[in-house]
Amino acid sequence: MKATGIVRRIDDLGRVVIPKEIRRTQMIRVGDPLEIFVSANGEVVFKKYSPVGEMSPLAATCVETVYKVAGVPLAVTDRDHTVAAAGAGREALEKPLHTGYVHLIEQRRTWQGTPGPVQICDGARVQAAAMAPILANGDLVGSVALVCRGQAPGEEEILLAKLTAALLGRELEIRLGGLNEAWH
C-alpha cells in the first residue's frame, strides 16, 4: 500500500481528494458509494461498496431458481463484475465486466440483443443475448444478463431477466432504506 500511497490533507469540511489516477485504476466513478472504516492498526480505509455484491447469496438463489424452473441461464452483475450466475453463465463468476457490456448497462434500459450478443466479462466466453438493468431508488446498481444459448431469446426469457432485475432492485431498496439519500 505504501508504494501507491499519496499524502493528502483534509479540508475544513473533512473532505479528502482521491487522485484521478487512483480513481481511474480502481474504476471509482463519480457518485460511487465508498465504505470508510478504520483497520486494527489505525489505517483509514476506503473500499468500494457494491450493494448488489452484498446480496449475492440472494441473487444466486434467484438465478438458480429461474434456471431450475424455466431452464433460462442468467448472470447478475454489479457495475464492475459478475456476482451470481446459473447455467452456462457460471464461467463468468467473479470476472470483471467487458467494456462493451458496461456501456449497455449505463444506458439504464433493457437491451434485447440487437445487433447481436455481447461479451459479458473479460476472461470468459459468456455472452449476453439480452440485459435488464437493476435499479434501486433510481440508481443504476447492476444488471441481469440473459446468457446466450445460440438462438435469439424469446419474449418470455427476456421477461424473466426483467423480472429478476426488478425483484433484486426492489430488495435493494428495502435493504438500503434511507441510505441512498446519503450517497447524493
What kind of feature is each model-predicted range?
Residues A3-T4, K68-G71, V126-A128:
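Short, small/polar residue-rich loop motifs at catalytic or cofactor-binding pockets
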Residues V7-A84, I174:
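Intrinsically disordered, low-complexity terminal regulatory regions
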Residues M27, G53-S56, E91-K95, C121, ...:
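A short local loop/turn or secondary-structure capping micro-motif enriched for an aromatic residue
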Residues V63-G123:
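Structured interaction and signal-relay segments at domain junctions
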Residues A128-L135:
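A short, aliphatic-rich beta-strand micro-motif
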Residues S56, A60-T65, G100-H103, G142, ...:
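Juxtadomain coupling helices with adjacent low-complexity linkers
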